[in-house]
UniProtKB/Swiss-Prot annotation:
Its EC number is 6.1.1.19. GO terms for biological process: arginyl-tRNA aminoacylation. It comes from Salmonella newport (strain SL254). A motif ('HIGH' region) lies at residues 122-132. It catalyses: tRNA(Arg) + L-arginine + ATP = L-arginyl-tRNA(Arg) + AMP + diphosphate. The gene is argS. This is Arginine--tRNA ligase. GO terms for molecular function: arginine-tRNA ligase activity; ATP binding. Keywords: Aminoacyl-tRNA synthetase, ATP-binding, Cytoplasm, Ligase, Nucleotide-binding, Protein biosynthesis. It comes from the Bacteria. SMART domains: Arg_tRNA_synt_N, DALR_1. Belongs to the class-I aminoacyl-tRNA synthetase family.
Amino acid sequence: MNIQALLSEKVSQAMIAAGAPADCEPQVRQSAKVQFGDYQANGMMAVAKKLGMAPRQLAEQVLTHLDLSGIASKVEIAGPGFINIFLEPAFLAEQVQQALASDRLGVSQPTRQTIVVDYSAPNVAKEMHVGHLRSTIIGDAAVRTLEFLGHHVIRANHVGDWGTQFGMLIAWLEKQQQENAGDMALADLEGFYRDAKKHYDEDEAFAERARNYVVKLQSGDTYFREMWRKLVDITMTQNQITYDRLNVTLTRDDVMGESLYNPMLPGIVADLKAKGLAVESEGATVVFLDEFKNKEGDPMGVIIQKKDGGYLYTTTDIACAKYRYETLHADRVLYYIDSRQHQHLMQAWTIVRKAGYVPDSVPLEHHMFGMMLGKDGKPFKTRAGGTVKLADLLDEALERARRLVAEKNPDMPADELEKLANAVGIGAVKYADLSKNRTTDYIFDWDNMLAFEGNTAPYMQYAYTRVLSVFRKADIDEQALASAPVIISEDREAQLAARLLQFEETLTVVAREGTPHVMCAYLYDVAGLFSGFYEHCPILSAENDAVRNSRLKLAQLTAKTLKLGLDTLGIETVERM
């Protein structure tokens, strides 16, 4: 149940009945403060201005047409014309019952769409580093949310598996194999790439061979394709270990690398020329875009084919968008790529729209994100100033969590401790990132992310186990509880119930905006409200069985909401801590 949508519809009908235009926006929002009710309709100002009347006068007229019987206990006008809506306790009780009766907690399913989500995108023959973390986990949280809502989601892992560097890498792999050290060299991808580059820079004969190999690979030579495939396979096998550790849903089947679009590139260049969008300029093929200006104020030239016949990332991204619409039949495409790529993507998509490859009705959305910074406010690095490998970061998270868990549970069996440390350590790294607005840079801080206070994974995981512990102590007859009514008579019961019933609204925002931090803030709020409810509304020592069972049901919905919400973020919950 989406209460916000229900109220929006009711207020909108009342506004139209009061003389507002049919497309009026009621602007129903969740209230920021308890004294303003559960929801506020803020749309009177804008509409009253169009109608040439005072907002408060319009609000009064709207109230005469607004029928919220059975939904709201009180509706009042505040300030210049805000309408405050206080939900009826009996309505809240009924919605809590319905949510508990459903596996989906009463969350409705929107019209099913095919949504392509482009995320992670590491490079072949390189180990994943911290720079890949944000795209991977934010993209995966979006995917989980969209799938839960019932959409057909296609994960697209746009790996960097093509380019001139592959001549160098194949030549180096060949050299290692001749020395019977091929597999050993590939076990350390980072070292393999570094050694290949060193030889390429220092040995002219090796560099010449590498350049010839690029040509052979690009012409489809079987031997070189096999060597290339070996590099891709070994890299993706290593990456899969990282994905599994991160509890990310990507698999090998989701790889749609740059090489996939190679066969399309000549046709796209020819088509853009035929449509008069691309022209020859200084030997290269260029699309001039009025929408982007260079330093002189002239239309910016975007190169799609170099003088030597080579293609660019832009050409691949044009082909990629076309493929996602024509072949994958996407209704919507989301790209989780860092903010530095924004202009590049906008230029590619401007060409895509002008060429008619993807209609305007299909959104192409750049869900960009900021950087991960160290405590010094500079990009996160190792002590020696190098790039932090993702595997090393996860090892450290596990080690720190292990110490933390062992400290709190000295007698816990080793296997249980390891499982708990994994959930806490990996959860802490992910949640610290997901709980920040993705558009901003954020400071990576071990102490903060592993704290048991504040908006952190350990706090949320602990909050969940705390709710479960109520049930362990209660010794409940599940069937008797299922048929027990929900009674809401205390303010703290009403506040917790109202917030729990905003789960669908929260999912809707995350799905629309691609902002998992909204879910984190919601769950943290729920945990805080439960804490206040637990303190002031005795559950197991309630005055009678009816109140006890009703409060147990509120606790039950809290546990289910926390678990399901954390699951949409890819954060594991545990039964005990």
